[in-house]
Amino acid sequence: FFDTAEMYSVPPKKETQGSTEKIIGNWFNERKNRDSIILATKVCGRAPFTWLREDKSPTEHSKKQIFEAVDKSLLRLKTDYIDLYQLHWPDRPMNLFGGPLNYQHIEGETNSIESILDGLSELIKIGKIRHIGLSNETPWGTMEFLHQSKNKNLPRVQSIQNAYNLLNRIFEFGGSEIVFREKVGLLAYSPLAQGYLTGKYQNGNLPKGSRKELFDRLQRYEGIGSEEAIEKYLDIAKKHNVDPSQLANQFVTTRPFVTSNIICLLYTSDAADD
């Protein structure tokens, strides 16, 4: 199972956009093994990433943009179909990625969930994608997609890809019940809390070449009590003579509501720990 996205690598910028899909596509071309891989990629939600679209407009989940994004991903991936096509984050305005907890309802023009599903349905019918999934979605959003697909006879969401780890267990509130009852698979990403659960950033450490040094966008795991919680997890790992990375990954992998644990490596040498 390979998971990527049209905007990768991160942080998103014009110079590197699509590079991860190109790497995977070249790998498929060399190995001739496309049919042995379940391939997932993602289309950007609403964001000011004007370099992604031909008309330089901000990204959104309009039918036109989704069709354009799929075609470009297929070219980069050197394939004629995508097994799982995911909405990277919601099209509607909302708090995301470590924002404040005091939710404020934000009204704004957005593509309806029905229209998004309708566009994805066309892509399934012509064979460019096979299944659809969500990412960084809320319990309400997940249920609304399921509701619309049932009522309008449109494709059903098969998965949701959200962050889940020892420092971020928000998915257990609402999300876990939905995936059980509705049979929607959780693809859990960031099992190491973007590296924090390895302990390498403790006491202000900043290893050279680490994700935090390369692009410091990890403040969501630097809140009050985070360092103390990490220290306690490190103590547990030490007590049982296991690597902290393995402890964190096994926690995610063994949860009964997790379908797959998505591991992201900055360097190939990290694979030994995971």
Q: Where in this protein do the model-derived segments appear?
A:
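Conserved small/polar residues in nucleotide/adenosyl-binding loops
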Residues: Y267-D274
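N-terminal binding-site loop/beta-alpha segment at the start of enzyme catalytic domains
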Residues: F1-V43, F67, D71, D80, ...
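Glycine-rich, positively charged active-site loop/lid region within alpha/beta enzyme cores that binds
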Residues: F49-T50, P93-H105, F180-I236
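Basic phosphate/pyrophosphate-binding loop/patch that engages nucleotide-derived ligands
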Residues: K125, F171, G175-G185
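Active-site beta-loop-alpha junctions enriched in small/polar residues
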Residues: M7, K42-R46, L87-P90, S135-W140, ...
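A structural motif corresponding to the C-terminal end of an alpha-helix
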Residues: R31-N33, R76-Y81, G119-R130, E182, ...
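Glycine/proline-rich, positively charged
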Residues: L52-Q161
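Conserved, mostly hydrophobic/aromatic
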Residues: F2, I24, L39, S73, ...
